[in-house]
A protein has these predicted regions:
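Extracellular/surface-exposed low-complexity segments
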Residues: 3-6, 28-37, 41, 274-277, ...
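Beta-strand-rich solenoid/repeat architectures in extracellular/passenger domains
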Residues: 32-44, 55-70, 83-97, 108-126, ...
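Outer membrane beta-barrel translocator domains of Type V secretion systems
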Residues: 65, 344-522, 526, 637-662
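Membrane-embedded beta-strands of outer-membrane beta-barrel proteins
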Residues: 84, 111, 141, 168, ...
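Solvent-exposed, glycine/polar-rich loop segments of beta-barrel outer-membrane systems
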Residues: 400-408, 440-450, 482-504, 538-560, ...
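Outer membrane beta-barrel transmembrane domains
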Residues: 520, 553-662
Length: 662
């Protein structure tokens, strides 16, 4: 009886356990996690492959190393989807991640790679991510790490997908090495492919992005903000072998090393190519049949592009010339910022004068014990002074509109002689400034668009008049500048080239300063001031050399800049011949430059590009000034200033001055 009850209870337990096992969701069996420090050598997904609802996770430091087969497999006929996250490393002989067969309509497979995916076999069956088939699931692939295939003689592709509605995004690196081993191949309908990272193919006939679909009803969007580098023969950067309507947005680099091949090759559909800010293309551009459109806009390096089989070409920023199927685009940055660069350096010299005169006190009457005034008793003149000042600054400004961001650095020397004259101090000055302007490179460290070195030589005169409680300081300087300019050109047929030119300019720059210093104590003086500085220049015409078909003749032009400055300084005299000054101020810069008239050298084709810099810039600054006597009749002055302005403009300036009294 006891045994009978035992067997009954045992049988019930077996039935219950069997029911639990039979009704358990498949995720229990086919989902997987590979922990950090763990190495797994079996194909993931179980015997039947991953099914709807399954998840896979490889932690950082985890390894899936399958030497005899595929890495991760799926069950055929998905209806909802599967998700996989790789933070570690997947290495497999054949396909690293192989999608399901059968009808997978409506299913979505999400693959996020933050680690490394490798395949090792020299075979066309060793794709890294393989989701072929017209009825495959929708693939959402986000690569933030590295996907690489090592097959040499066979076409082991990094990503290959059929189906519909795929969203493929590369933020990391995709590399293939083999013959016909495309980085991304798809025949899907209505797909989106985005490359924000780096794509490299090294095998013959291996394309960066290859879209193959004979259908006419589909659309596809390809966006490249990163780099697509194709290193072997008969290989294209982007190949559209289809009848679909395709939109290609490029703000990155597409480069093919085979000069007979296309960087972008269109299909027979209506293709639209948008060349946006940062676009650089080296290789043939041929959009083939269909009613194709190329739109060129944004801030870019100068470029010369031959656009083959393009029915509509639109230059949206008016900074280029279209002759036949050749577009000459000119970066207007170098010409547009010339007034801002000039006014920055001239203002630095004016400020040297203003800083030194801020220390001068109004001439005092001689105190004598008599009621009569005779000649020579009105004012006591000071001894003449000779001074010299080294100055320098680093300045930068961000991109604005189609004007690229740039760095402006300068160093120089100015000196002068100063003496008293009646109720004033007057002086002569001269000096030179060597400056460098470079447009900033992009995040890939690619070429700078403009690199200009300038040597400026100037002379001038200044005076300070004491008008009761107000001091009036005027300065007038004029000079000559010698410029050496390099302009980078991206020629899609001839590669990266440099257009070089030497030219000169003349400038004049007066300034006027009103100041009203007054004592706030025995050792403290407040020094409010207001300064207006004008700078005007005429740049002579010049012709470039050094490129195959992109040299320009630049006509002469005038530039103008006006800077207004309000400042409040507080000076503390810590001993008789020593002083520390702190100042704060606000500035406004207004520029008025002509547009740039250009001729394409050797052709006579003339066009005009706009001046695109911001003509009204407002900012502020802080500065400190230290003045000490180092020996008898000789003072040393050190000055540092930091400022910011609209448009992401920032500067740091320094000055070191020595002055001696006769």
């Amino acid at each position: 009886m006891v045994m009978s009850d035992f067997y009954k209870q045992f049988a019930q337990a077996v039935l219950i356990a069997g029911g639990i096992i039979a009704s358990a969701p498949s995720v229990w069996a086919d989902s997987f996690t590979i922990n950090s420090g763990e190495t797994v050598t079996a194909t993931q997904g179980g015997d039947g492959g991953m099914v709807d609802g399954d998840t896979g996770l490889i932690e950082s430091g985890g390894f899936l190393n399958v030497t005899g087969s595929k890495g991760i497999a799926f069950s055929d006929g998905l209806s909802t989807g599967v998700s996989i996250i790789n933070n570690g490393r997947i290495t497999s002989l054949n396909d690293a991640i192989e999608g399901p067969g059968g009808d997978n309509t409506g299913a979505i497979v999400t693959v996020i790679n933050n680690g490394v995916i490798h395949t090792t076999e020299d075979s066309g069956n060793a794709d890294a991510v393989n989701f072929t088939g017209s009825n495959g699931p929708t693939l959402i692939l986000i690569n933030n790490g590295t996907i690489e295939t090592f097959g040499i003689s066979q076409g082991a592709e990094a990503v290959v997908a059929g189906g519909t509605g795929h969203i493929i995004t590369n933020n990391g690196t995709i590399i293939t090495r083999g013959i016909t081993a495309d980085a991304i191949t798809t025949s899907c309908a209505n797909c989106t492919i985005t490359n924000n990272g780096t794509i490299i193919t090294r095998g013959r006939g291996a394309h960066g992005i290859f879209y193959l679909n004979p259908g006419t009803q589909e659309t596809i969007t390809i966006t490249n903000t990163g780099s697509i580098l194709v290193e072997a023969q008969t290989s294209n950067g982007i190949l559209l072998n289809n009848e679909a309507d395709t939109i290609v947005n490029n703000s990155g680099l597409i480069r093919v090393l085979d000069s007979t091949e296309e960087a972008i090759r269109g299909g027979s559909g209506a293709d639209t190519l948008n060349l946006l800010s940062g676009s650089q293309i080296i290789g043939i551009i041929d959009l083939n049949n269909g009613t194709d459109i190329v739109n060129i806009s944004g801030a870019n390096n100068s470029s010369t592009l031959t656009l083959t089989d393009v029915e509509n070409i639109n230059l949206l920023n008016s900074n280029g010339l279209l002759v036949g199927d050749v577009v000459t685009m000119v970066d207007p940055t170098g010409q547009s910022i010339s007034s801002a660069v000039l006014s920055t350096t001239t203002s630095a010299v004016h400020n040297v004068v203003n800083q030194r005169l801020a220390h001068n006190q109004a001439l005092k009457p001689i105190q004598v014990a008599t009621s009569e005034l005779t000649s020579g008793m009105m004012f006591q003149e000071r001894a003449p002074q000779i001074w010299g000042s080294a100055l320098g600054a680093v300045r930068e400004r961000d991109l604005e509109g189609i004007a690229l961001g740039y760095d402006h650095n300068y160093v120089g020397f100015t000196g002068g002689y100063e003496a008293s004259f009646y109720k004033a101090r007057i002086g002569l000055l001269g000096g030179f400034v060597r400056s460098e302007v470079k447009t900033t490179g992009d995040k890939f460290g690619r070429i700078r668009s403009v690199d200009t070195d300038t040597d400026s030589f100037f002379v001038g005169a200044y005076s300070q008049y004491f008008l009761g409680g107000i001091n009036l300081t005027t300065t007038l300087m004029a000079g000559y500048e010698d410029h050496k300019n390099d302009r980078a050109v991206v020629d899609n047929l001839n590669g990266l080239e440099t257009a070089q030119a030497d030219f000169s300019s003349l400038f004049i720059s007066p300034s006027l300063t009103l100041s009203a210093p007054y004592r706030a104590g025995e050792q403290v003086e407040l020094r409010p001031s207001m300064t207006f500085t004008y700078s005007g220049a005429r740049y002579n015409d010049y012709i470039e050399s050094g490129t195959t078909r992109s040299n320009l003749f630049i006509n002469n032009r005038n530039v103008h800049a006006l800077i207004g400055q309000l400042q409040l300084a507080a000076a503390y005299s810590f001993f008789e011949d020593g002083e520390f000054e702190f100042r704060a101020g606000a500035t406004a810069r207004y520029t008025d430059d002509n547009d740039i008239d250009i001729n394409l050298a050797g052709t006579g084709a003339a066009f005009r590009i706009p001046n695109v810099s911001d003509d009204s810039v407002y900012g502020g600054y802080l500065g400190v000034n230290l003045r000490v006597a180092i020996v008898d009749r000789m003072n040393l002055i050190a000055d540092v200033e930091h400022g910011r302005a609209g448009g992401g403009e920032e500067h740091l300036a320094a000055m070191l001055k020595l002055e001696g009294v006769f």
